[in-house]
Regions:
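Glycine-rich phosphate-binding loop
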Residues: 41-80
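Glycine-rich phosphate/diphosphate-binding loop of Rossmann-like nucleotide-binding domains
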Residues: 1-33
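Short, glycine-/small-residue-rich phosphate/pyrophosphate-handling segment
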Residues: 83-108
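Short coil/turn connectors at secondary-structure junctions
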Residues: 20-23, 47-51, 71-75, 88, ...
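Hydrophobic/aromatic ligand-binding patch that stacks against planar heteroaromatic rings
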Residues: 16, 66-69, 94
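N-terminal beta-loop-helix "entrance" segment that forms/cooperates
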Residues: 24-48
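Short glycine/serine/threonine-rich phosphate/pyrophosphate-binding segments
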Residues: 6-11, 34-38, 57-66, 85-88
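Short, ordered loop/turn segments at secondary-structure junctions
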Residues: 4, 29-31, 58-59, 80-83, ...
Length: 108
């Protein structure tokens, strides 16, 4: 997720993964504020056994697209409500990926 303010929503995904017995990593890295850290973390994900990323982000929601650009396996983008537009900005950001950067979008 891109910010600790996203933890309230994204922790629900963690609960579901735990109930299903699926191991996971939960990390907070901003695509806008920490791009180098995001690149390093994402490029090493597959070697750590990660098979799918669930990337939650609000507002401009660059995180899911950046993850998809750097990670060869599936990325699920979760648009989160920001300060404006009730999360619709994040929905459109995640749904409008360029060709070759696939992101599945899951919204509540």
């Amino acid at each position: 997720m891109g910010s600790d303010s996203d933890l309230k929503v994204m922790s629900k995904a963690a609960v579901m993964l735990e109930e299903l017995g699926i191991e996971y990593e939960m990390t907070i890295i901003s695509a806008h504020r920490e791009p180098d850290e995001l690149i390093e973390w994402t490029r090493g994900a597959e070697s750590r056994g990660i098979k799918v990323m669930i990337a939650g982000a609000g507002m401009a929601a660059a995180l899911p697209g950046m993850c998809a650009a750097l990670f060869a396996l599936p990325v699920i983008g979760v648009p989160l409500s920001g300060k404006n537009l009730d999360g619709m900005d994040a929905v459109f950001s995640i749904m409008q990926m360029p060709p070759g950067v696939p992101v599945a979008t899951v919204a509540n």
